[in-house]
Regions:
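A short tyrosine-centered beta-strand micro-motif
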Residues: 95, 102-111
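Tryptophan-paired
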Residues: 71-101
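Short acidic/polar alpha-helix capping motifs at helix-coil junctions
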Residues: 59-61, 74-76, 110-111
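Acidic, divalent-cation-chelating loop motifs in proteins
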Residues: 112-116
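Positively charged n-region of N-terminal signal peptides that target proteins for export
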Residues: 1-5
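Bacterial N-terminal signal peptides
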Residues: 8-18
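Primarily secretory-pathway and cell-envelope proteins
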Residues: 20-69, 120-175
Length: 175
């Protein structure tokens, strides 16, 4: 009886490991920064992709409302934090994307599923997500929805991608 319960616990633990985001393929130019948990980086586990077309973009901005979603060339010219990593999603399985961060502290994050391959966001086809996972509705993500506090090693966040869902605006596919 005791060996049966130990075997059940072992099987349950093995199953949890197999479906955990830790087993996801880590993508992006900065994937090595998340390997082994060394960092400094942010690993975003992506949930709710509509499909596996196009690219996943993850952008890191300063944690100031006036800088969130500002053009990258302006932020870089002013010497402010900005980083973008992008990658094609794997054909199947769980997906995580990694982005290097300059230091511990507060930042804002924006995830984009660029399904059509254009540099400009396509409202009718692209997906978007932020760390708070609150429905985006019919407006750009708000600053407070995108803020994330990060430590000196690898910080893990889960982001549910949202797509245009008719008149109510952007929301997860399963809502």
């Amino acid at each position: 009886m005791k060996s049966a319960s130990v075997a059940s616990l072992f099987l349950a633990a093995l199953t949890m490991f197999a479906i955990s985001p830790a087993s996801a393929e880590i993508i992006g130019e900065d994937a090595a920064a998340c390997a082994g948990g060394h960092g400094p980086a942010i690993q975003v586990n992506i949930v709710g992709l509509k499909d596996r077309t196009g690219e996943i973009w993850l952008e890191l901005y300063p944690a100031t409302e006036s800088d969130f979603l500002r053009p990258d060339q302006d932020l870089v010219a002013e010497g402010k934090v900005f980083r973008r990593t992008r990658s094609r999603p794997p054909a199947s399985g769980a997906v995580s994307i990694c982005i290097r961060k300059p230091h511990a502290g507060r930042f804002t994050l924006m995830l984009r599923h660029n399904r059509v391959g254009k540099d400009k966001f396509s409202v009718f086809s692209d997906g978007a997500g932020v760390p708070s996972n609150k429905p985006l509705g019919r407006s750009k993500p708000k600053f407070d929805q995108a803020v994330i506090g990060v430590g000196p090693t690898v910080t893990v966040a889960n982001i549910r991608v949202q797509y245009l869902r008719g008149l109510r605006g952007f929301a997860p596919l399963d809502s």
